[in-house]
Amino acid sequence: MDDSKNIIIKGARVNNLKNVDVEIPRGKLVVVTGLSGSGKSSLAFDTLYAEGQRRYVESLSSYARQFLGQMNKPECDFIKGIPPAIAIEQKVNNRNPRSTVGTTTEIYEYLKLLYARIGKTYSPISGTLVKKDTPEDLLTCMNSHPEGEKFMLLAPIPKRKGRKLQEQLEIYLQQGFTRVVLGKEIVRIEDYTPQKGETPALLIDRLSVSRSNETASRLLDSAETAFYEGNGECLLQFLSEEQPYRFSIRFEADGIEFEEPTEQMFSFNSPIGACPDCEGFGRIVGIDEDLVIPNKSLSIYDGAVFCWRGDKMGEWKTEFCRRAPQDNFPIFEPYYNLTQEQKDYLWHKGPWIEEYGEGICIDRFFDMVKANQYKIQYRVMLARYRGKPICPTCHGTRLKKEATYVKVGGTSITELVEMPVSRLKVFFDNLVLDEHDAAIAKRILTEIRSRVDCLLDVGLGYLTLNRLSNTLSGGESQRINLVTSLGSALVGSLYILDEPSIGLHSRDTDRLIKVLYRLRDLGNTVVVVEHDEEIIRAADYIIDVGPKAGSYGGNIVYRGNMSDLAPGSNSYTVKYLLGEETIDVPAYRRTSNNYITIKGARENNLKGIDVKFPLNLLTVVSGVSGSGKSTLVRNILYRSLMRHFGNSCDTPGQCDSVDGALKQLCGVELVDQNPIGKSSRSNPVTYLKVYDDIRHLFAQQPLAKQLGFGAGHFSFNSDGGRCDECKGEGTITVSMQFMADLKLECEACHGKRFKNEVLEVKYHGKNIYDILEMTVGDAINFFQEYGQKRIAENLQPLQDVGLAYIKLGQSSSTLSGGENQRVKLAYYLSRQSDRPTMFIFDEPTTGLHFHDIKKLLKSFERLIARGHSLVIIEHNMDVIKCADYLIDLGPEGGEAGGQLVVAGTPEEVVACEASYTGKFLREKL
């Protein structure tokens, strides 16, 4: 490689990196791979990105730097040739409740411009186009009539405050006007006596239709006068016609003056465009429909309205059901089948009761509850049904109603943002504009189309532009940031991405690779931390960090292209890519006669499907992104089972029933990627309850007994042994008022979390801080060496799930989503429980190398051997091929998904031509 075109790192020692030297070619797609914990992120993010960011900040003025703070130099000898660095991580950093997919990708900014520039306003009353008239419009109207036809140009006489009509007519006489018109009758002003109810118009000019320039010029001049005298309005009365043609220079139609489109009119972040009731949030604090009617499959007669239950409140239901049929309301119809008009009747109108002077409806019921909220039971009831429902004024669109009157291609901006991106592409591809509008919108449409295409390329065609950013998964958020980066068209930069393939089906990986190539071809260096085989094979250059994890990793075990791979390497990545190591297909598939059956699943995009989940098997739910996997498994299966076992949870997704062999299960556990603890002091050993044994071990040491230390002195969650200054955190948080809080190492304990006298207690030369700083692998060896088998055995599950590299005392806040999930799996493996439980995993292979996946599958086998059932949402083909039973949803994402494509063994799925999963699985079997 040419040194002048490379990024050169010498002696990198960040975290577990062992003084590594590495060259990264500029302007290439470089994949950094290796086992979990081998040092990939330490190299890519903590060294490369940290230095690129630091140098960029150093290049700014001292004034700008004061707002950015001091950035530490990564621990290495030197780094040369590094461009400005941009990190695109999996974290969902945007917690702003106003941020959406549209605003993040900037598509919405261009839509606002488009609607402000070429949007056409239509009257909601008649549907006619609202526009300002000009004198040229009068000329066009005249030319549409036959030559020689006579007509009059009139100005309506506006009412002047404090001035009578007679006085106004006298002023007209003084100005040189002589006649008014009543109907078609012309009357001299001095001869006219105003009568009540009459509306005369001022005669400006009388002409005959002619195509001559002289007539056109005269009409245009007279039209200017007519508009001025008529306060922006004028009339053309053809003598052969009864009704005059009305023209106005005001933006009005049907007697309503409309607001002219501007960018701010379509901004929900501006008071000019935001809905006045919800202030642009789309939701208000009020009575929540989902809480009032939790089961939408029930009819009103069967008790769909949850607050109309019990002896006293039930009277409302009884009275409603007795009277509503008179208004043709279907009281026996399931709530989800009611029309919007029928729902409005139930909520806002109801059957009218003469003696009360109001209707029986849900709104009236809660008015009664609010009127009685001085009583505790009514306050409790109000709190129970209060949530953040969709704003009834804007129906969740966030904009005021005037914005919805403006349309492009017959569609309002609120309709566009509710379309999936896949439909948005069709809309803009088929958008037909006239020559004038096309010229104005050319650049805007180019930007919109390129960003929409990019969203499709990264597999996000199922998202809508109004989807909130804080509801996206880490993988979705990262790919949206990738789209934003492409849109900004930066060149000569260093992009560092963290597993962009997360949450992506194999079908979409090829398109993601093309997006990465586009970013590279702009002139950027793209460094991707990745485990996906297709992306590794597509790389221009591969850097493998290893050979193992933690203290056994941190070396560069391979660098080069795919063509340079050679057998006999100590790199696990090379071994798997060359087929020297493989994840084997199971010799046989287990079967089961017991199922949990979901019937009529129709939450979100699910199309009323019936699905069976076999017990005591490894069941994988697959399908392209947005096909409905999480909705089926998390929203319906998990929540329904939680309710069945008497646990509180969110309302289960809509379905007809969840039944089957429920008695065969004793519980359900969702092993997700949320942090393992709410406190920054929580860590893997406290979560697995191993720390109790370690604390008791230290309390038994002679010095501890001599000083009177109990197990509590070795806890950083209680006073006694922990540092009094930092309360066992190891850091002090300094509030920076308007800036992010600053964390500084505690000066009292120097980050060791305990008092000096506690740290003097040692077990075979190690104090409690030294033990917490050990990796899981080192700790297992240490405790086995000194006969502490119980502690070593309890730590073993962490090693079994591929977490040998994490430190025992590592704060849960520093663990990735995938690591959190595997710590939870280790906890369940350590419990040795034989109560049959259904475990639900959502993409457990996140952040895992081929070799780690092999270990993970062995952990799954151990759970099944104990009589448990596993349901896994997964895209990874190595896990899918090992499933006993496969449920494939699709065929596409979003509206085109939500159907059961095929269910059965992997071999049966491969035989299904309609299954995308089957096509890619065929290569693995």
Where are these regions (language model features)?
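Conserved phosphate-binding elements of NTP-dependent enzyme cores
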Residues: 1-925
